[in-house]
Amino acid sequence: MKMLKIALLQLTPEPNAEAAMKSGVAACREAAANGADIALFPEMWSNGYAYTDYRDSGAGEAWMAAAVRPDSPFVRSFQDAAKELNMAVAITYLETHEPRPRNSVTVFDRLGRRVLHYSKIHICTFETECFCSPGDKFSVAMLETRHGPVQIGAMICFDREFPESARVLALLGAELVLVPNACVFDDHRTMQMQTRAFENKVALAMTNYPDTHIGGNGSSLAVSPIAWELDGTNPRSQYRETLMLRTGPGPGIHYCEFDLDAIRHYRENAIWGTTFRQPQTYDILIDSKLVPVYKDNPALIH
């Protein structure tokens, strides 16, 4: 049995990148001491997803000025921590980019190698993220762990509201999707995450901010794709709860474990997922002419 342990760092954000670096590395040390294979931060840890008035161009300029480079001391500190602690780290930050910064996550493996870099594609242009540039590609990477290789992908917060995000990652071969988050997480969004896991046969781990953050309420999640017991003696199978963990509202480090062997067995034998798709009928899904303009979109102002 290969149990992959993930630390969900549901932590109170810091006022700046330097403070976030110090408290974040300390959290990684605690996670490693408790046997975690991956430490996952909430969305945009470098500035705590600092909300600002998107109608105030001056506030927007200040917000964008807080962006950090992928080779900055902030990011490198987590690369160094991953190597020192023999634990993968998924660190999130407002990334320097032209013409506007990006909302990004970088995953370093336990040897300190950068294996995945993803920038949020579905940015919230109706609020503070109107000061961001969207990413342009979903990707999957092989993460080497103490239990062997795992195919991982990432989507960030609002990405999970679109079924295409998880489906693309599934088509690329993801077994586990890491989801940094920064918003109030309710029952609807929880069920949405369960649906993403079920329909794509992927495991999901999501870290949110606690209720000490203006945009958080905890409720970090771990969701298994295994919705049915595949018992060969029972042709009807048996329903299985997929919500493995839903945390409380306060700050803390929470842990979840995924049985990789069981997930892989399920992926090979359950009918859901990508095997029986009929993509020749899905043309409308990529017809951008059908996308309506959100009339209150501030991105049309800035």
Each model region followed by its residue ranges:
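Short beta-strand-to-turn element immediately C-terminal to the catalytic PLP-Schiff-base lysine
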Residues: 108-109, 143, 223-225, 256
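Short polar catalytic/cofactor-binding loops
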Residues: 10-17
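CN hydrolase (nitrilase-like) catalytic-core segments centered on the catalytic cysteine
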Residues: 67-89, 160-255
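Cys-nucleophile CN-hydrolase/nitrilase-fold catalytic domain and related Cys-dependent amidase chemistry
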Residues: 17-18, 22, 26-111, 115-117, ...
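Active-site catalytic loop in hydrolytic enzyme cores
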Residues: 80, 96-175, 180-181, 185-195, ...
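A short, polar/charged loop-to-alpha-helix boundary motif
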Residues: 120-133, 251-266
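Extreme N-terminal starter segment of soluble prokaryotic enzymes
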Residues: 1-7
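A short C-terminal boundary segment appended to hydrolase-like catalytic domains
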Residues: 253-302
